[in-house]
Amino acid sequence: GLVSSIGRALGGLLADVVKSKGQPA
């Protein structure tokens, strides 16, 4: 559903942010 799609998108965005913060830029 729409909510699931939004949740998945937000989850992916959060994962990307955490990954970039965990690595030296």
Curated annotation (Swiss-Prot):
Expressed by the skin dorsal glands. The keyword Secreted applies. One of its GO terms (biological process) is defense response to Gram-negative bacterium. It holds the Pfam family Antimicrobial24. It is found in: Secreted. Keywords: Amphibian defense peptide, Antibiotic, Antimicrobial, Secreted. The keyword Ribonucleoprotein does not apply. InterPro entries: Frog_Litoria. It comes from the Eukaryota. GO terms for cellular component: extracellular region. Belongs to the frog skin active peptide (FSAP) family. Caerin subfamily. Antibacterial peptide with narrow spectrum of activity. Active against the Gram-negative bacterium P.multocida (MIC=25 ug/ml). Inhibits the formation of NO by neuronal nitric oxide synthase with an IC(50) of 9 ug/ml. This is Caerin 2.1. It comes from Litoria peronii.
